[in-house]
Amino acid sequence: MQFAFDNSFHADMQGFYAPAEAAKPSAPRLLAFNDALAERLGFDRRGVDADELARVFSGEELPEGAAPIALAYAGHQFGHFSPQLGDGRALLLGEIVAPDGARFDIQLKGSGPTAFSRGGDGKAAIGPVLREFLVSEAMAAMGVPTTRALAAVTTGERVERERAHPGAVLTRVASSHIRVGTFQFFAAHFGADHVVQLSDYSIARHFPDLADAANPHLALLDRVIGLQCALIARWLGVGFIHGVMNTDNVAISGETIDYGPCAFMDRFAANTVFSSIDATGRYAYGRQPQIMHWNMARFAEALLPAIHRVSPADVEAAKALVDAIPGRFRAAWHAQVREKLGLSTSAGDDAELIDRLFDELEKHSVDFTTFFRALAMLLRGEGAMMQALLPAPDAMAPWIADWWQRIEQDAANPLDLADAMDAVNPLYIPRNHRVEAALEAAEAGDPAPWLELLEVVRQPFAARAGRERFAEPAPADAAPYTTFCGT
């Protein structure tokens, strides 16, 4: 299989990575390949069979032009600074430039130990690999910025975690793997010269329009803050809980990265947590905006040497950007919710309507995803879906009446609004009980349920006959759902 590698990070950023080599798997076998993404990247699959794909995307066979490296980074993990983390179980094969000119990293995740493994085996189990493949594809289909999955390959080996699991390797595609933690590593260990170099590279790669700004490093901070505000608003809009929002899991590209213990909320509760390692609820659904703010403050701290070098006065400007984050996020969030509610204009009392909505959803323990589809059905004159969803006929009645009044202010066609709402409010998400059942089946050797679920979540908005069960939340008496990071 031919790759047109153009490895700018390897060539331009020496000292920011360590050479790496993939472990050779005993019997690689292709589980899934993302043909649509491969086409987007300009890969030519003609004449390439599943065995060759398995060899390449397990790390057994190095493609021509690859320059495998493991990237260095640090990070705040649950609020505590770890000065050296890095790619402990992943290697960057290289970069390709797609036909449209976009540049992407091609990374193998679970490919064996690196210089940053800190005693770990560098491997991945099949469950976390298939979870990231599935959820990242669902997020992409819902329009949420995200890394993507190109391939999943089993290795023929067992990986020891709490018990032995089949080993696997994920091929991840990202605009880059530059993280907030990347800046933190070089700010902590090497100082201003390296931070300036990393910032200059990041601007050239991701945001070339910032190069002519009065202070490009300050402009980078501003841009990344804007992307993160928009990203977290999108997460909240689909009920997504990342689970481990450490600074090493924040990509400056604004893409969702490192799915680990992620999950989706069923019944709305702002304090929802699924991750087994988040005992204090630091990364709960409703705390994600505050954590984003905290992470961006850490990014600003790491960038300060570069910002100060151009203009010492801009240090105060950086502080002002960080202080303004809550307002910027709230604007992004309100715009997101207005879209979900079918509101085509902005009105002064929208903030109160939105805040009351989430109070009501929590009070009545309403399924978050289904509610917005039921709301659209009201615009079509059909109330059965909403009646079945709410615990009592008059539950949320005052709020719904106020929403109707607000809809009428926009003077739009209700049927057109309903269609617009259905185009942004997913019907099918990776429901946790469905994900778990699919992963258990795949680990037992039956990938069919996982493949079916993948097909469903890749088309999240349009209702399809025979797929009704995928829109249903977990049974009310289901045990609490817990996720694990898989490392």
UniProtKB/Swiss-Prot annotation:
Its cofactor is Mg(2+); Mn(2+). Its EC number is 2.7.7.-, 2.7.7.108. The keyword Cell cycle does not apply. ATP binds at G86, G88, R89, K109, D121, G122, R172, R179, D258. GO terms for molecular function: AMPylase activity; ATP binding; magnesium ion binding. Keywords: ATP-binding, Magnesium, Manganese, Metal-binding, Nucleotide-binding, Nucleotidyltransferase, Transferase. It comes from the Bacteria. The active site is at D248. It catalyses: L-seryl-[protein] + ATP = 3-O-(5'-adenylyl)-L-seryl-[protein] + diphosphate; L-threonyl-[protein] + ATP = 3-O-(5'-adenylyl)-L-threonyl-[protein] + diphosphate; L-tyrosyl-[protein] + ATP = O-(5'-adenylyl)-L-tyrosyl-[protein] + diphosphate; L-histidyl-[protein] + UTP = N(tele)-(5'-uridylyl)-L-histidyl-[protein] + diphosphate. Transmembrane segments: none annotated. InterPro entries: SelO (IPR003846). Signal peptide: none annotated. Pfam families: SelO. Disulfide bonds: none annotated. Mg(2+) binds at N249, D258. PANTHER family: PROTEIN ADENYLYLTRANSFERASE SELO, MITOCHONDRIAL. Belongs to the SELO family. Nucleotidyltransferase involved in the post-translational modification of proteins. It can catalyze the addition of adenosine monophosphate (AMP) or uridine monophosphate (UMP) to a protein, resulting in modifications known as AMPylation and UMPylation. This is Protein nucleotidyltransferase YdiU. It comes from Sphingopyxis alaskensis (strain DSM 13593 / LMG 18877 / RB2256).
